[in-house]
Structure formats: C-alpha cells, structure tokens
C-alpha cells in the first residue's frame, strides 16, 4: 500500500512492459539498464558502488530502508545508481548508526525511486529475457510516452562508463578499516616496511582501498587514463586494477596501460572490472551476461574449495579465449563462468568478485594477503 501522500510513479521496460507504483525519491525521469540485486542487506553500499553507474537497481528483498543510511557505509562520494526499484520501503528507519531515511537520502542526491512493484515478477522477467534498458518517471505516466525516452538510451554493451566515475586527480588513500569492524588492520603487517600500491581507478570502492591500507600498503589512486610510464614513476611494489562500470572492452586506455604494465612484471591484482581488463590485456575476450551476477551469496571455487562471494557485474571473461600461459583459478558455480585467473609464471592474478565485501561475506579476504605476499617476496628478491 502507498504511504499517505505518495506520488504515482511508473517503471517501463524497453519491451514496453509497464509497472505502476509510487515514488519514494526525487521527482523526474530517469533511464538506465534495469538489473536486480539479490542481497538481503547492504542497499547503501550497492547504491554508492560506482560499478552500478548507469543502472536502475531492483532490490529483490521485499523491505528496503529499514536501517536507514549513514556516512560510514558509503562506498564512494555519492550514489551512482540511475534509479531504485523496491517492493516496500520505510520512512522511519531503526538502527543506532542511522542518520537519515532512505527516501530523504534519495531526494538529497536526486535519485528517483519507485516502490509498490512486484519485484519478484520483475526479477523473473529479467532472468528470463535478460537485463534491458528501462525508465522510471514521476512526470511521464503514460507507458508509450516513457518508452520513447527509453528507446533513445544507449545499450550497456560497448559503453565506457569508467570515464564518468574515475578520479580526476591523483590522491593517496590512508584510511584503514576500523578496529571495531570484524576485519580491522592486520596485526602481522603492522611495523613492517610499507608497500606502495598504485590503484588504477576504474570506479574503485572505498573498502577495497581500506583493505589494502589495512594490510600495510601505501595506496596511491590514479585516474583510469594514467599511462604506464606515469604509474611506474611512483616505483610501485604492486599494481591494483579496480572494479568499475560498463563494458570492459570499451575501456581502451586502461587496457593499453595494463598491457604495458605487464612488461614491468610487478605483482598485479584485479577485482571485477580489473579482472576483465587484466584478462583482455592477456589476450582474452569478454562477453555480456544475460542478466549478470549481483548479490551477496554467489558460490565460487575450483575442485573441493568453495567461497561464498559478493558480486556485481554484467560481463565475464570468455573461458575459451584464455592464452596457454593463463589458468583459471575460480569458476562461478551457478553458471560455470570464469571467476578467477592467474598467470602461470608471472605475479598477475584477478577475481570476478569482491573480496573486500561491503556488503557481503569475507571468505575471500585472503586475496589481499596473497597480493601483499607477492609484493614482499618480489621486493626481497630485488633487495637480495
């Protein structure tokens, strides 16, 4: 049921399917790729994850906004979603860290939201037909009129959205995870010489930077357009390739830079978009998934070991395109797509999921330790 005085809103998919509901965010019209996220928690982290740039996110969990929002859970400086779709929402959150309700937060950041939608039916449609463009409006309440706006929007395939979310200036990240968090600073790394990591920012999440800092890394974040020569001027011990939105094959500057960085043979770790860019740089290909992987309980593994992982991506590395010197370390166990790879001889590895969680499980936090060990090992070999 709508909250008293709620304004009518309309969601329409690119195939013309209408979903009438009520507004719980800003007024206006928005168009983006309609996707779904199956997580029961973490809506604030999802909305502020730059990887969701250009997307209207359907939350499958039937209640949204119960814990409000707060400054600590922001994964970037502002939300990047184009819109939010919910079954039911609350305007009166209950959580000791909450400083604002979700509807007020969306209004502040000019994000359009619609609730009262049968999100189960919508999700089943997206699973069956595939993710597609759509639009939400509080102004245009006739499906055919809104459809004209949707049809004018570009497809996610071939779209370079990294340029919209990458940093424009180089900066150093110093904040590590707090002591009261389950995964705080890593004790065995305290007191050791710091490692310099240059993070190529395709749309990096803050908790990735926190985890690197927690493992004793000095993290320098650079724009996605930074050249290999400029990166190597920092004399990094390792190079990190971040997550990000859009089609990885369209991030041409990042691919060229990564190819050139491979020649330096420095330890390299990629997450999500970074995994795809590393794969492309090693000669692989990528393809668009039918509806993507977005949620907190995606099983990944190889042989006997399984990790429950947080994922958010709509593209994947094509298994048959990998070069002989590259091996698969993980598969997504739901659909057997490539979820991790590494070079057989050189210190390059990547995963298609988010070991930093935020939100999600911490099964794969060990990958940050693996990266640190590779850097310390190479540094010791050079010094010795």
Curated annotation (Swiss-Prot):
InterPro entries: Anth_synth/Amidotransfase, CarbamoylP_synth_ssu, CarbamoylP_synth_ssu_N, CarbP_synth_ssu_N_sf, Class_I_gatase-like, CPSase_GATase1, GATASE. L-glutamine binds at residues 51, 244, 246, 273, 276, 312, 314-315. One of its GO terms (biological process) is 'de novo' UMP biosynthetic process. Its EC number is 6.3.5.5. It catalyses: hydrogencarbonate + L-glutamine + 2 ATP + H2O = carbamoyl phosphate + L-glutamate + 2 ADP + phosphate + 2 H(+). PROSITE patterns: GATASE_TYPE_1 (PS51273). GO terms for cellular component: carbamoyl-phosphate synthase complex; cytoplasm. It comes from the Bacteria. SMART domains: CPSase_sm_chain (SM01097). Pfam families: CPSase_sm_chain (PF00988), GATase (PF00117). One of its GO terms (molecular function) is carbamoyl-phosphate synthase (glutamine-hydrolyzing) activity. Residues 1-192 are annotated as: CPSase. Residues 196-381 form the Glutamine amidotransferase type-1 domain. Pathway: Amino-acid biosynthesis; L-arginine biosynthesis; carbamoyl phosphate from bicarbonate: step 1/1; Pyrimidine metabolism; UMP biosynthesis via de novo pathway; (S)-dihydroorotate from bicarbonate: step 1/3. The active site is at 272 (nucleophile), 354, 356. Belongs to the CarA family. Small subunit of the glutamine-dependent carbamoyl phosphate synthetase (CPSase). CPSase catalyzes the formation of carbamoyl phosphate from the ammonia moiety of glutamine, carbonate, and phosphate donated by ATP, constituting the first step of 2 biosynthetic pathways, one leading to arginine and/or urea and the other to pyrimidine nucleotides. The small subunit (glutamine amidotransferase) binds and cleaves glutamine to supply the large subunit with the substrate ammonia. Composed of two chains; the small (or glutamine) chain promotes the hydrolysis of glutamine to ammonia, which is used by the large (or ammonia) chain to synthesize carbamoyl phosphate. Tetramer of heterodimers (alpha,beta)4. This is Carbamoyl phosphate synthase small chain. The gene is carA.
């Amino acid at each position: 049921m709508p909250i008293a005085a709620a304004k009518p809103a309309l969601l329409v998919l690119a195939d013309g399917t209408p979903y009438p509901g009520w507004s719980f965010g800003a007024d206006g019209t928005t168009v983006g790729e309609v996707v779904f996220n199956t997580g029961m928690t973490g809506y604030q982290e999802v909305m502020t994850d730059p990887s969701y740039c250009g997307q209207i996110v359907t939350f499958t969990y039937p209640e949204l906004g119960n814990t409000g929002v707060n400054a600590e859970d922001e994964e970037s400086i502002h939300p990047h979603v184009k819109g939010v779709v919910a079954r039911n929402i609350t305007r009166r959150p209950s959580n000791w860290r909450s400083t604002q309700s979700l509807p007020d937060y969306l209004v502040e950041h000019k994000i359009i939201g619609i609730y009262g939608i049968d999100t189960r039916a919508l999700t089943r449609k997206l699973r069956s037909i595939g993710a597609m463009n759509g639009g939400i409006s509080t102004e245009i309440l006739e499906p055919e009129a809104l459809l004209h706006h949707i049809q004018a929007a570009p497809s996610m395939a071939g779209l370079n959205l990294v340029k919209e979310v990458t940093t424009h200036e180089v900066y150093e990240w110093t904040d590590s995870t707090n002591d009261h968090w389950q995964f705080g600073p890593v004790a065995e790394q305290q007191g050791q010489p710091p490692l310099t990591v240059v993070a190529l920012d395709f749309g990096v999440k803050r908790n990735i930077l926190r985890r690197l800092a927690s493992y004793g890394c000095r993290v320098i974040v650079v724009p996605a357009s930074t050249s290999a020569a400029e990166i190597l001027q920092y004399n990094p011990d390792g190079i990190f390739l971040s997550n990000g939105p859009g089609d990885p094959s369209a991030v041409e500057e990042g691919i060229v830079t990564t190819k050139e960085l491979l020649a330096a043979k420095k330890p390299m770790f990629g997450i999500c978009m970074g995994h795809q860019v590393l794969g492309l740089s090693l000669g692989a290909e990528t393809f668009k998934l039918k509806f993507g992987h977005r949620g907190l309980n995606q099983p990944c593994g190889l042989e006997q070991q399984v990790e429950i992982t947080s994922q958010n991506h709509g593209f994947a590395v094509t298994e048959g395109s990998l070069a002989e010197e590259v091996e698969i370390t993980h598969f997504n166990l739901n659909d057997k797509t490539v979820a991790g790879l590494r070079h057989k001889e050189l210190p390059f590895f990547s995963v298609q999921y988010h070991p930093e969680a935020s939100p999600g499980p911490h099964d794969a936090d060990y990958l940050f330790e693996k990266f640190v060990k590779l850097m310390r090992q190479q540094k010791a070999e050079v010094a010795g």
